[in-house]
Design a protein with these regions (language model features):
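Catalytic cores of the polymerase beta-like nucleotidyltransferase superfamily
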Residues: 1-537
Length: 537
Protein backbone atom coordinates (compact mmCIF):
# COMPACT_ATOMS: atom_id res chain seq x y z
CA UNK A 1 0.00 0.00 0.00
CA UNK A 2 2.88 2.40 0.75
CA UNK A 3 4.01 2.36 -2.88
CA UNK A 4 0.54 1.89 -4.28
CA UNK A 5 -0.02 5.24 -6.03
CA UNK A 6 0.27 5.25 -9.78
CA UNK A 7 -0.69 8.52 -11.41
CA UNK A 8 -2.96 8.66 -14.42
CA UNK A 9 -1.79 10.63 -17.43
CA UNK A 10 -3.84 13.65 -16.37
CA UNK A 11 -2.62 13.43 -12.77
CA UNK A 12 0.99 13.21 -13.96
CA UNK A 13 0.46 16.31 -16.12
CA UNK A 14 -1.04 18.15 -13.16
CA UNK A 15 1.91 17.13 -10.97
CA UNK A 16 4.40 18.46 -13.52
CA UNK A 17 2.49 21.71 -13.95
CA UNK A 18 2.50 22.34 -10.20
CA UNK A 19 6.21 21.58 -9.97
CA UNK A 20 6.89 23.94 -12.86
CA UNK A 21 4.99 26.71 -11.06
CA UNK A 22 6.98 26.00 -7.91
CA UNK A 23 10.24 26.37 -9.86
CA UNK A 24 8.91 29.49 -11.58
CA UNK A 25 8.24 31.11 -8.19
CA UNK A 26 11.96 31.08 -7.38
CA UNK A 27 12.82 32.98 -10.56
CA UNK A 28 10.70 35.93 -9.43
CA UNK A 29 12.96 36.65 -6.49
CA UNK A 30 10.14 37.14 -4.01
CA UNK A 31 10.53 33.68 -2.49
CA UNK A 32 13.94 32.50 -1.38
CA UNK A 33 12.81 28.91 -0.92
CA UNK A 34 11.08 26.86 -3.58
CA UNK A 35 7.71 25.71 -2.20
CA UNK A 36 7.34 22.00 -1.51
CA UNK A 37 4.08 20.64 -2.83
CA UNK A 38 2.01 17.72 -1.64
CA UNK A 39 -1.31 16.20 -2.58
CA UNK A 40 -3.12 15.87 0.73
CA UNK A 41 -5.94 14.08 2.47
CA UNK A 42 -8.80 12.42 0.66
CA UNK A 43 -7.19 12.08 -2.75
CA UNK A 44 -4.24 10.16 -1.25
CA UNK A 45 -6.57 7.93 0.76
CA UNK A 46 -8.76 7.17 -2.23
CA UNK A 47 -5.81 6.45 -4.53
CA UNK A 48 -4.40 3.97 -2.02
CA UNK A 49 -7.83 2.30 -1.89
CA UNK A 50 -8.08 2.17 -5.67
CA UNK A 51 -10.90 4.72 -5.81
CA UNK A 52 -11.26 7.54 -8.32
CA UNK A 53 -11.19 11.12 -7.08
CA UNK A 54 -11.33 14.41 -8.99
CA UNK A 55 -11.01 16.56 -5.86
CA UNK A 56 -7.40 17.30 -4.94
CA UNK A 57 -6.07 19.38 -2.05
CA UNK A 58 -2.58 20.75 -2.74
CA UNK A 59 -0.63 21.59 0.43
CA UNK A 60 2.05 24.27 -0.08
CA UNK A 61 5.00 24.71 2.27
CA UNK A 62 5.90 28.40 2.10
CA UNK A 63 3.12 30.53 0.64
CA UNK A 64 -0.65 30.81 0.83
CA UNK A 65 -2.95 29.07 -1.58
CA UNK A 66 -4.08 32.34 -3.11
CA UNK A 67 -0.46 33.39 -3.72
CA UNK A 68 0.36 30.10 -5.42
CA UNK A 69 -2.83 30.27 -7.46
CA UNK A 70 -1.87 33.72 -8.72
CA UNK A 71 1.54 32.37 -9.72
CA UNK A 72 -0.17 29.57 -11.64
CA UNK A 73 -2.15 32.09 -13.64
CA UNK A 74 1.03 34.04 -14.40
CA UNK A 75 2.99 30.95 -15.36
CA UNK A 76 0.49 29.52 -17.85
CA UNK A 77 0.60 32.81 -19.77
CA UNK A 78 4.33 32.39 -20.45
CA UNK A 79 5.29 31.33 -24.00
CA UNK A 80 7.18 28.25 -22.76
CA UNK A 81 4.16 27.18 -20.70
CA UNK A 82 1.83 27.64 -23.67
CA UNK A 83 4.13 25.44 -25.74
CA UNK A 84 4.22 22.76 -23.04
CA UNK A 85 0.60 22.72 -21.90
CA UNK A 86 -2.83 23.10 -23.45
CA UNK A 87 -4.38 26.52 -23.91
CA UNK A 88 -6.88 27.47 -21.21
CA UNK A 89 -5.53 24.77 -18.92
CA UNK A 90 -6.73 26.73 -15.88
CA UNK A 91 -10.30 27.38 -14.97
CA UNK A 92 -11.52 30.39 -13.04
CA UNK A 93 -9.50 31.10 -9.90
CA UNK A 94 -11.53 31.76 -6.77
CA UNK A 95 -9.95 33.01 -3.57
CA UNK A 96 -11.51 32.12 -0.23
CA UNK A 97 -10.39 34.54 2.46
CA UNK A 98 -9.17 33.30 5.81
CA UNK A 99 -12.19 33.18 8.10
CA UNK A 100 -11.56 32.27 11.74
CA UNK A 101 -15.24 32.46 12.65
CA UNK A 102 -16.88 29.34 14.02
CA UNK A 103 -14.03 26.90 13.50
CA UNK A 104 -13.42 27.56 9.80
CA UNK A 105 -9.80 28.59 9.44
CA UNK A 106 -8.68 28.00 5.87
CA UNK A 107 -7.31 30.40 3.32
CA UNK A 108 -7.49 28.64 0.00
CA UNK A 109 -7.67 29.26 -3.69
CA UNK A 110 -9.89 27.00 -5.75
CA UNK A 111 -9.67 26.36 -9.46
CA UNK A 112 -10.33 23.71 -12.05
CA UNK A 113 -7.32 22.22 -13.85
CA UNK A 114 -7.43 19.36 -16.37
CA UNK A 115 -10.85 18.37 -15.10
CA UNK A 116 -9.73 18.28 -11.45
CA UNK A 117 -11.24 20.46 -8.73
CA UNK A 118 -8.17 21.85 -6.99
CA UNK A 119 -7.92 23.48 -3.56
CA UNK A 120 -4.63 25.27 -2.91
CA UNK A 121 -3.78 25.78 0.76
CA UNK A 122 -0.64 26.37 2.79
CA UNK A 123 0.59 23.83 5.33
CA UNK A 124 -0.59 25.12 8.66
CA UNK A 125 -0.46 24.77 12.38
CA UNK A 126 -3.49 25.49 14.53
CA UNK A 127 -3.25 26.41 18.21
CA UNK A 128 -6.41 26.38 20.31
CA UNK A 129 -6.83 27.98 23.73
CA UNK A 130 -9.60 27.96 26.32
CA UNK A 131 -9.87 31.75 26.01
CA UNK A 132 -11.05 31.76 22.39
CA UNK A 133 -13.18 29.34 20.41
CA UNK A 134 -11.06 30.09 17.34
CA UNK A 135 -7.47 28.94 16.90
CA UNK A 136 -4.46 30.96 15.94
CA UNK A 137 -3.34 29.80 12.51
CA UNK A 138 0.19 30.01 11.17
CA UNK A 139 2.41 28.31 8.65
CA UNK A 140 3.27 24.83 9.81
CA UNK A 141 5.41 21.84 8.99
CA UNK A 142 4.04 18.76 7.21
CA UNK A 143 3.98 16.99 10.60
CA UNK A 144 1.99 19.79 12.23
CA UNK A 145 -0.43 19.90 9.31
CA UNK A 146 -0.95 16.14 9.45
CA UNK A 147 -1.55 16.08 13.20
CA UNK A 148 -4.29 18.72 13.12
CA UNK A 149 -6.37 16.74 10.58
CA UNK A 150 -9.58 14.91 11.45
CA UNK A 151 -8.31 11.34 11.02
CA UNK A 152 -5.10 9.47 10.39
CA UNK A 153 -6.30 8.10 7.05
CA UNK A 154 -6.95 11.67 5.89
CA UNK A 155 -3.51 12.84 7.06
CA UNK A 156 -1.46 11.08 4.39
CA UNK A 157 0.50 13.14 1.86
CA UNK A 158 1.75 12.41 -1.65
CA UNK A 159 5.00 14.33 -2.06
CA UNK A 160 5.15 15.75 -5.59
CA UNK A 161 8.92 16.16 -5.44
CA UNK A 162 9.72 12.56 -4.41
CA UNK A 163 6.55 10.78 -5.66
CA UNK A 164 6.34 9.09 -2.25
CA UNK A 165 3.45 8.74 0.17
CA UNK A 166 4.23 10.26 3.58
CA UNK A 167 2.63 9.20 6.88
CA UNK A 168 3.60 11.82 9.45
CA UNK A 169 1.13 10.53 12.07
CA UNK A 170 2.81 7.13 11.95
CA UNK A 171 -0.61 5.42 11.89
CA UNK A 172 -2.23 6.37 8.59
CA UNK A 173 -1.14 3.29 6.66
CA UNK A 174 -1.93 1.03 9.59
CA UNK A 175 -5.43 2.44 10.13
CA UNK A 176 -6.15 2.28 6.41
CA UNK A 177 -5.27 -1.42 6.44
CA UNK A 178 -7.18 -2.05 9.69
CA UNK A 179 -10.17 -0.08 8.38
CA UNK A 180 -10.29 2.20 11.40
CA UNK A 181 -11.24 5.88 11.73
CA UNK A 182 -8.98 7.43 14.37
CA UNK A 183 -7.95 10.99 15.20
CA UNK A 184 -4.20 11.71 14.98
CA UNK A 185 -4.21 13.31 18.45
CA UNK A 186 -6.32 12.73 21.58
CA UNK A 187 -9.94 12.51 20.33
CA UNK A 188 -11.52 14.56 23.12
CA UNK A 189 -9.28 17.55 22.43
CA UNK A 190 -9.54 17.04 18.66
CA UNK A 191 -13.34 17.13 18.76
CA UNK A 192 -13.33 20.01 21.23
CA UNK A 193 -11.16 22.05 18.85
CA UNK A 194 -13.54 21.45 15.95
CA UNK A 195 -16.72 19.48 16.75
CA UNK A 196 -17.51 19.04 13.06
CA UNK A 197 -14.81 16.36 13.08
CA UNK A 198 -17.36 14.15 14.84
CA UNK A 199 -19.60 14.20 11.78
CA UNK A 200 -16.68 13.86 9.41
CA UNK A 201 -15.56 10.72 11.25
CA UNK A 202 -19.06 9.31 10.93
CA UNK A 203 -19.18 10.21 7.24
CA UNK A 204 -15.92 8.46 6.41
CA UNK A 205 -16.78 5.45 8.56
CA UNK A 206 -20.10 5.08 6.72
CA UNK A 207 -18.70 5.75 3.27
CA UNK A 208 -15.77 3.34 3.62
CA UNK A 209 -17.55 0.90 5.97
CA UNK A 210 -14.79 1.38 8.56
CA UNK A 211 -15.03 1.18 12.34
CA UNK A 212 -14.57 4.23 14.54
CA UNK A 213 -11.90 3.66 17.18
CA UNK A 214 -13.48 2.93 20.61
CA UNK A 215 -11.72 5.87 22.29
CA UNK A 216 -13.03 8.18 19.56
CA UNK A 217 -16.57 6.91 20.05
CA UNK A 218 -16.26 7.51 23.78
CA UNK A 219 -15.19 11.09 23.14
CA UNK A 220 -18.12 11.62 20.76
CA UNK A 221 -20.51 10.70 23.59
CA UNK A 222 -18.97 13.27 25.94
CA UNK A 223 -21.50 15.89 27.01
CA UNK A 224 -19.15 18.81 26.32
CA UNK A 225 -18.50 17.57 22.79
CA UNK A 226 -22.22 17.11 22.15
CA UNK A 227 -22.92 20.63 23.41
CA UNK A 228 -20.17 22.04 21.20
CA UNK A 229 -21.52 20.17 18.17
CA UNK A 230 -24.94 21.63 18.83
CA UNK A 231 -23.87 25.23 19.41
CA UNK A 232 -20.38 25.95 18.09
CA UNK A 233 -20.57 24.82 14.47
CA UNK A 234 -22.52 26.71 11.82
CA UNK A 235 -25.48 24.64 10.72
CA UNK A 236 -24.50 25.13 7.08
CA UNK A 237 -21.39 23.05 7.78
CA UNK A 238 -23.55 20.44 9.51
CA UNK A 239 -25.80 20.35 6.44
CA UNK A 240 -22.89 19.66 4.10
CA UNK A 241 -21.72 16.70 6.18
CA UNK A 242 -25.20 15.20 6.55
CA UNK A 243 -26.05 15.54 2.87
CA UNK A 244 -22.73 14.00 1.87
CA UNK A 245 -23.50 11.05 4.13
CA UNK A 246 -26.72 10.55 2.18
CA UNK A 247 -25.20 10.75 -1.31
CA UNK A 248 -25.14 14.47 -2.16
CA UNK A 249 -24.24 16.15 -4.49
CA UNK A 250 -24.40 13.35 -7.10
CA UNK A 251 -26.77 10.62 -5.87
CA UNK A 252 -26.73 8.92 -9.28
CA UNK A 253 -22.96 8.43 -8.90
CA UNK A 254 -23.03 7.17 -5.31
CA UNK A 255 -22.62 3.37 -5.07
CA UNK A 256 -23.06 3.42 -1.29
CA UNK A 257 -26.40 5.22 -1.74
CA UNK A 258 -27.67 2.77 -4.33
CA UNK A 259 -26.55 -0.14 -2.15
CA UNK A 260 -28.04 1.51 0.97
CA UNK A 261 -24.92 0.69 2.99
CA UNK A 262 -23.51 4.20 3.38
CA UNK A 263 -26.60 6.19 4.40
CA UNK A 264 -27.83 3.39 6.65
CA UNK A 265 -24.48 3.15 8.41
CA UNK A 266 -24.37 6.92 8.90
CA UNK A 267 -27.82 7.12 10.48
CA UNK A 268 -27.20 4.07 12.65
CA UNK A 269 -23.97 5.63 13.95
CA UNK A 270 -25.70 8.92 14.72
CA UNK A 271 -28.37 6.91 16.54
CA UNK A 272 -25.97 4.64 18.44
CA UNK A 273 -23.76 7.55 19.50
CA UNK A 274 -26.85 9.42 20.75
CA UNK A 275 -26.19 12.44 18.53
CA UNK A 276 -29.62 12.82 16.92
CA UNK A 277 -30.69 15.73 19.13
CA UNK A 278 -27.41 17.51 18.45
CA UNK A 279 -27.84 17.31 14.67
CA UNK A 280 -31.51 17.26 13.70
CA UNK A 281 -32.71 19.96 16.03
CA UNK A 282 -33.21 23.70 16.41
CA UNK A 283 -30.02 24.91 18.15
CA UNK A 284 -31.42 28.44 18.44
CA UNK A 285 -34.03 27.25 20.95
CA UNK A 286 -32.49 26.62 24.36
CA UNK A 287 -35.76 25.02 25.49
CA UNK A 288 -36.15 22.78 22.44
CA UNK A 289 -37.36 19.38 23.61
CA UNK A 290 -35.38 16.22 23.03
CA UNK A 291 -37.28 14.11 20.55
CA UNK A 292 -37.69 10.38 21.20
CA UNK A 293 -35.47 8.32 18.88
CA UNK A 294 -35.98 4.88 20.44
CA UNK A 295 -37.98 3.68 17.41
CA UNK A 296 -36.03 5.50 14.70
CA UNK A 297 -33.94 2.44 13.86
CA UNK A 298 -37.03 0.67 12.52
CA UNK A 299 -37.40 3.34 9.85
CA UNK A 300 -33.82 3.40 8.56
CA UNK A 301 -33.55 -0.39 8.82
CA UNK A 302 -36.73 -0.75 6.78
CA UNK A 303 -35.48 1.57 4.04
CA UNK A 304 -32.21 -0.35 3.86
CA UNK A 305 -34.09 -3.64 3.59
CA UNK A 306 -36.33 -2.30 0.83
CA UNK A 307 -33.34 -1.14 -1.19
CA UNK A 308 -31.26 -4.26 -0.69
CA UNK A 309 -34.03 -6.83 -1.08
CA UNK A 310 -33.80 -6.84 -4.86
CA UNK A 311 -37.57 -7.30 -4.98
CA UNK A 312 -39.34 -5.13 -7.53
CA UNK A 313 -42.62 -4.88 -5.65
CA UNK A 314 -44.92 -1.87 -5.91
CA UNK A 315 -43.29 0.02 -3.03
CA UNK A 316 -39.85 -0.09 -4.63
CA UNK A 317 -40.97 0.31 -8.24
CA UNK A 318 -43.46 3.12 -7.62
CA UNK A 319 -41.88 5.05 -4.76
CA UNK A 320 -38.17 4.48 -5.43
CA UNK A 321 -38.29 3.78 -9.15
CA UNK A 322 -39.99 7.08 -9.87
CA UNK A 323 -38.99 9.46 -12.69
CA UNK A 324 -36.56 11.10 -10.24
CA UNK A 325 -34.38 7.97 -10.36
CA UNK A 326 -31.62 7.82 -7.71
CA UNK A 327 -32.73 11.20 -6.40
CA UNK A 328 -35.91 9.54 -5.12
CA UNK A 329 -33.80 7.27 -2.93
CA UNK A 330 -31.69 10.21 -1.78
CA UNK A 331 -34.90 12.00 -0.79
CA UNK A 332 -36.12 8.88 1.01
CA UNK A 333 -32.97 8.84 3.17
CA UNK A 334 -33.36 12.56 3.85
CA UNK A 335 -36.94 12.08 4.98
CA UNK A 336 -35.92 9.14 7.16
CA UNK A 337 -33.75 11.56 9.13
CA UNK A 338 -36.89 13.37 10.28
CA UNK A 339 -39.17 10.43 11.09
CA UNK A 340 -38.71 10.98 14.87
CA UNK A 341 -40.35 14.40 14.50
CA UNK A 342 -43.34 13.11 12.52
CA UNK A 343 -45.94 13.15 15.31
CA UNK A 344 -44.66 16.16 17.22
CA UNK A 345 -47.06 19.12 17.46
CA UNK A 346 -46.69 22.34 15.51
CA UNK A 347 -43.97 24.66 16.77
CA UNK A 348 -43.39 28.39 16.56
CA UNK A 349 -40.03 29.60 15.19
CA UNK A 350 -37.92 31.61 17.63
CA UNK A 351 -38.10 35.41 17.23
CA UNK A 352 -40.62 35.14 14.45
CA UNK A 353 -44.21 36.14 13.89
CA UNK A 354 -44.60 33.62 11.10
CA UNK A 355 -47.20 30.87 11.16
CA UNK A 356 -46.45 27.75 13.18
CA UNK A 357 -44.36 25.09 11.47
CA UNK A 358 -44.27 21.35 11.69
CA UNK A 359 -41.60 20.26 14.14
CA UNK A 360 -39.78 18.32 11.42
CA UNK A 361 -39.72 21.36 9.13
CA UNK A 362 -38.32 23.54 11.89
CA UNK A 363 -35.66 20.94 12.73
CA UNK A 364 -34.72 20.81 9.04
CA UNK A 365 -34.62 24.58 8.61
CA UNK A 366 -32.63 25.32 11.76
CA UNK A 367 -30.81 22.04 12.32
CA UNK A 368 -29.28 21.55 8.88
CA UNK A 369 -30.29 24.84 7.24
CA UNK A 370 -32.21 22.90 4.62
CA UNK A 371 -32.45 24.68 1.30
CA UNK A 372 -35.91 25.49 -0.04
CA UNK A 373 -36.29 22.35 -2.14
CA UNK A 374 -35.44 20.06 0.78
CA UNK A 375 -37.45 22.14 3.24
CA UNK A 376 -40.55 21.85 1.03
CA UNK A 377 -39.98 18.11 0.61
CA UNK A 378 -40.00 17.61 4.38
CA UNK A 379 -42.81 20.08 5.03
CA UNK A 380 -45.03 18.42 2.41
CA UNK A 381 -44.34 14.96 3.82
CA UNK A 382 -45.26 15.88 7.39
CA UNK A 383 -48.19 18.11 6.43
CA UNK A 384 -49.83 15.35 4.37
CA UNK A 385 -48.85 12.47 6.65
CA UNK A 386 -52.22 11.90 8.29
CA UNK A 387 -54.20 12.38 5.08
CA UNK A 388 -52.06 9.79 3.27
CA UNK A 389 -52.48 7.27 6.09
CA UNK A 390 -56.24 7.83 6.15
CA UNK A 391 -56.60 7.41 2.39
CA UNK A 392 -54.53 4.23 2.47
CA UNK A 393 -56.38 2.83 5.49
CA UNK A 394 -59.80 3.59 3.99
CA UNK A 395 -59.10 1.26 1.09
CA UNK A 396 -57.45 -1.39 3.24
CA UNK A 397 -60.42 -1.33 5.63
CA UNK A 398 -62.95 -1.68 2.83
CA UNK A 399 -61.03 -4.57 1.31
CA UNK A 400 -60.95 -6.40 4.62
CA UNK A 401 -64.58 -5.85 5.57
CA UNK A 402 -66.27 -6.43 2.22
CA UNK A 403 -63.79 -8.96 0.77
CA UNK A 404 -64.16 -7.01 -2.48
CA UNK A 405 -61.32 -5.27 -4.31
CA UNK A 406 -61.89 -1.63 -5.06
CA UNK A 407 -61.25 -2.35 -8.72
CA UNK A 408 -64.65 -4.04 -8.90
CA UNK A 409 -66.58 -0.99 -7.78
CA UNK A 410 -69.24 -0.11 -10.28
CA UNK A 411 -70.96 3.01 -11.53
CA UNK A 412 -71.01 6.28 -9.64
CA UNK A 413 -69.16 4.82 -6.68
CA UNK A 414 -66.11 3.94 -8.79
CA UNK A 415 -66.19 7.31 -10.57
CA UNK A 416 -66.27 9.31 -7.34
CA UNK A 417 -63.66 7.05 -5.79
CA UNK A 418 -61.17 7.75 -8.58
CA UNK A 419 -61.90 11.47 -8.39
CA UNK A 420 -61.34 11.50 -4.63
CA UNK A 421 -57.97 9.76 -4.85
CA UNK A 422 -56.85 11.81 -7.84
CA UNK A 423 -57.63 15.11 -6.13
CA UNK A 424 -55.84 13.92 -2.99
CA UNK A 425 -52.66 13.09 -4.91
CA UNK A 426 -52.80 16.44 -6.69
CA UNK A 427 -53.10 18.15 -3.31
CA UNK A 428 -50.04 16.23 -2.07
CA UNK A 429 -48.18 17.66 -5.04
CA UNK A 430 -45.19 16.73 -7.14
CA UNK A 431 -43.44 15.16 -4.13
CA UNK A 432 -46.34 12.81 -3.39
CA UNK A 433 -44.26 9.65 -3.82
CA UNK A 434 -41.72 10.89 -1.27
CA UNK A 435 -44.54 11.89 1.06
CA UNK A 436 -46.02 8.40 0.84
CA UNK A 437 -42.60 6.90 1.59
CA UNK A 438 -42.38 9.12 4.67
CA UNK A 439 -45.80 7.96 5.83
CA UNK A 440 -44.81 4.33 5.30
CA UNK A 441 -41.56 4.68 7.26
CA UNK A 442 -43.34 6.57 10.04
CA UNK A 443 -45.91 3.80 10.40
CA UNK A 444 -43.23 1.10 10.34
CA UNK A 445 -41.33 2.97 13.07
CA UNK A 446 -44.46 2.89 15.22
CA UNK A 447 -44.94 -0.88 14.99
CA UNK A 448 -43.88 -3.25 17.77
CA UNK A 449 -43.17 -6.46 15.88
CA UNK A 450 -41.94 -7.59 12.47
CA UNK A 451 -45.39 -9.03 11.85
CA UNK A 452 -46.98 -5.63 12.47
CA UNK A 453 -44.44 -4.00 10.17
CA UNK A 454 -45.25 -6.49 7.42
CA UNK A 455 -48.94 -5.65 7.75
CA UNK A 456 -48.06 -1.99 7.16
CA UNK A 457 -45.96 -2.88 4.12
CA UNK A 458 -48.69 -5.10 2.68
CA UNK A 459 -51.21 -2.30 3.13
CA UNK A 460 -49.08 0.18 1.21
CA UNK A 461 -48.31 -2.38 -1.50
CA UNK A 462 -52.01 -3.06 -2.08
CA UNK A 463 -52.85 0.63 -2.07
CA UNK A 464 -50.09 1.54 -4.54
CA UNK A 465 -51.16 -1.28 -6.86
CA UNK A 466 -54.68 0.10 -6.64
CA UNK A 467 -53.52 3.61 -7.57
CA UNK A 468 -51.65 2.11 -10.51
CA UNK A 469 -54.72 0.19 -11.66
CA UNK A 470 -56.65 3.46 -11.68
CA UNK A 471 -53.89 5.09 -13.75
CA UNK A 472 -53.31 7.73 -11.07
CA UNK A 473 -49.55 7.53 -10.59
CA UNK A 474 -48.93 10.61 -12.75
CA UNK A 475 -52.14 12.44 -11.95
CA UNK A 476 -50.18 15.27 -10.31
CA UNK A 477 -49.07 16.22 -13.83
CA UNK A 478 -52.57 16.13 -15.34
CA UNK A 479 -53.36 19.33 -17.27
CA UNK A 480 -56.87 20.70 -17.95
CA UNK A 481 -58.11 19.49 -21.31
CA UNK A 482 -59.02 23.08 -22.22
CA UNK A 483 -56.81 26.12 -21.63
CA UNK A 484 -57.99 29.24 -19.86
CA UNK A 485 -58.01 31.45 -22.96
CA UNK A 486 -60.15 28.89 -24.78
CA UNK A 487 -62.62 28.97 -21.91
CA UNK A 488 -62.84 32.76 -22.00
CA UNK A 489 -63.57 32.63 -25.73
CA UNK A 490 -66.17 29.91 -25.21
CA UNK A 491 -68.00 32.04 -22.65
CA UNK A 492 -67.21 35.32 -24.41
CA UNK A 493 -66.17 36.99 -21.18
CA UNK A 494 -63.13 38.34 -19.39
CA UNK A 495 -60.87 36.37 -17.11
CA UNK A 496 -61.08 36.38 -13.35
CA UNK A 497 -61.23 34.07 -10.37
CA UNK A 498 -63.80 31.97 -12.19
CA UNK A 499 -61.16 30.74 -14.67
CA UNK A 500 -59.12 28.86 -12.06
CA UNK A 501 -62.33 27.46 -10.56
CA UNK A 502 -63.45 26.32 -13.99
CA UNK A 503 -60.09 24.68 -14.71
CA UNK A 504 -60.36 22.79 -11.42
CA UNK A 505 -63.85 21.77 -12.45
CA UNK A 506 -62.41 20.34 -15.67
CA UNK A 507 -59.78 18.36 -13.76
CA UNK A 508 -62.54 16.83 -11.65
CA UNK A 509 -64.46 15.94 -14.82
CA UNK A 510 -61.35 14.39 -16.36
CA UNK A 511 -60.79 12.29 -13.24
CA UNK A 512 -64.35 11.00 -13.46
CA UNK A 513 -64.04 10.41 -17.20
CA UNK A 514 -60.50 9.13 -17.82
CA UNK A 515 -61.38 7.66 -21.22
CA UNK A 516 -62.84 10.85 -22.69
CA UNK A 517 -60.57 13.30 -24.48
CA UNK A 518 -63.14 15.60 -26.11
CA UNK A 519 -63.02 19.23 -25.06
CA UNK A 520 -66.75 19.57 -25.68
CA UNK A 521 -67.59 17.29 -22.77
CA UNK A 522 -65.36 19.24 -20.41
CA UNK A 523 -66.82 22.57 -21.49
CA UNK A 524 -70.32 21.16 -21.10
CA UNK A 525 -69.46 20.30 -17.48
CA UNK A 526 -68.38 23.90 -16.88
CA UNK A 527 -71.61 25.15 -18.49
CA UNK A 528 -73.61 22.87 -16.21
CA UNK A 529 -71.88 24.39 -13.17
CA UNK A 530 -71.78 27.95 -14.54
CA UNK A 531 -73.78 29.45 -11.71
CA UNK A 532 -71.77 27.62 -9.04
CA UNK A 533 -68.51 28.87 -10.60
CA UNK A 534 -69.74 32.49 -10.73
CA UNK A 535 -69.00 32.86 -14.42
CA UNK A 536 -70.00 36.39 -15.43
CA UNK A 537 -72.68 36.80 -18.12
Amino acid sequence: MRNGIKLTEQEATLRQLLLDVSSYSVTLGGHHQKPELRFAGGWVRDKLLGLLSNDIDVAISSMTGSEFGSLMKQYVELPEARDKYENDILGRLAKIEANPEKSKHLETATLKVLGFDIDLVNLRKETYTDVSRNPSVEFGTPEEDALRRDSTINALFYNLQTSEVEDFTGRGFQDLQRKVIKTPLAPLQTFKDDPLRVLRSIRFASRLMYEIAPEDEMAMRDSTIKAALRLKITRERVRVEILKMLGWPKPHQSPSLLEASGPHRALSLIDRLDLYNEVFTDPTDADCKLVDTTKWHRAYNQLRDMVKSGSEGPIRSILLGSPEGPEALYHAWLLTCFVPWAREPLMFPQKSSKRPMTAASLAAREGIKAENKIYRLIDDAVSHLQDIIEKKNAISHEDQTTKLTIKRKQGASAVLHREMLGLAIRKWGANWRSSVMYALLTEVAETKTETDAQVVLDGYSSWLLHLSSLNLLDVDQLEPIVKGDTLMKAFNTKGGKWVSLALNCMIEWQLRNPDRTDAAGAIAEVVRRKEELNIPP
